[in-house]
Design a protein with these regions (language model features):
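Positively charged, amphipathic and often flexible ligand-engagement surfaces
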Residues: 1-294
Length: 295
């Protein structure tokens, strides 16, 4: 919604995004959606998360927009990527803000938790600028942080203010979230989310057994079809990465070598939930730097 996002012009960028998000939210409020049970609700708008450099900007724009009185009763959504060590801290800030909002009679918001699908772009930026890699550099910590965020979000006092969207095609991650929701008696406050055309047999089974499932489908006009290329490349990467569940999903059998490989990875990440790094990889603070003429 804004092509000139700049971290250096933080306040100005957030103000512009706030104006544009407000316009979108107003239209969403004016156009209702009828659920299968006949209940009418305002159209739902989810604010996606892409590049690491936009993380704080996206969060600030989301909060500032919803803090306006006209959106006090509107439920919008935001996405956080578990492959960023920073995301769990953002989730906690979001949750505390949402709790205060709900306590005052405001509408809850929704958080979609994903693992992240822009690793190659983040690696490129890191190399080109000689910066530390923003995401984790290993899958174990990504998976552990994902569970850490899901576990925190599933706590009854948290999920009632910040409803959850559990976005995954991994059977182990889906089962982990489902068990937590059942144990905490919060199944009414979360739903599974998947992508159209990905692990369709898993999607069908989930719909038959879990009921509430949100399916994402990309849309691009013929004139703007080039915009779909980035989406396609990310999906190809997810379907071929050696450690990724989707690589093995089509013919996966319980008890097979592939199943045991994936199970062991899941169990290792469960053991590392509280050990995954929770502080940013990029810690440069220019306000504390000392000028060295020799450099």
């Amino acid at each position: 919604i804004y092509s000139q996002i700049s971290s250096l012009a933080f306040e100005e960028t957030v103000a512009t995004l706030k104006d544009r998000l407000s316009a979108i939210y107003r239209v969403a409020k004016q156009n209702s959606f009828t659920r299968p049970n006949g209940v009418k609700v305002a159209k739902f708008v989810n604010l996606d998360m892409e590049e690491y450099r936009d993380l704080e900007i996206t969060y600030a724009a989301f909060i500032d927009t919803l803090n306006q009185e006209e959106f006090f009763d509107y439920s919008a959504g935001i996405v956080l990527q578990a492959y960023l060590p920073d995301s769990s801290a953002i989730q906690r800030k979001l949750t505390e803000w949402a709790k205060e909002r709900v306590a005052k009679g405001g509408a809850p918001v929704k958080l979609r938790i994903v693992k992240g699908a822009n690793m190659e772009m983040e690696k490129l930026e890191s190399v080109l600028n000689n910066w530390p890699l923003a995401p984790y550099d290993n899958k174990l910590e990504v998976d552990a942080n994902y569970k850490y965020m899901v576990r925190y979000g599933m706590e009854p006092e948290n999920i009632k203010a910040v409803n959850l969207g559990i976005a995954s095609h991994n059977l182990f991650e889906l089962a982990y979230a489902a068990v937590l929701a059942w144990e905490n008696a919060v199944t009414d406050y979360f739903c599974f989310e998947m992508l159209e055309g990905m692990a369709d047999h898993v999607r069908r089974t989930l719909q038959e057994n879990a009921g509430d499932l949100l399916l994402y489908a990309p849309v691009a006009s013929k004139e703007e079809f080039i915009n779909a290329i980035g989406y396609l490349i990310r999906r190809l990467d997810e379907n071929t990465a050696p450690e990724n569940f989707l690589r093995y999903s089509p013919d996966l059998q319980a008890g097979s070598a592939e199943w045991n490989f994936l199970k062991e990875g899941f169990l290792r990440s469960c053991s590392s939930i509280d050990n995954a790094q929770k502080v940013p990889n990029r810690v440069q603070d220019r306000e504390k730097e000392q000028y060295d003429p020799a450099i």
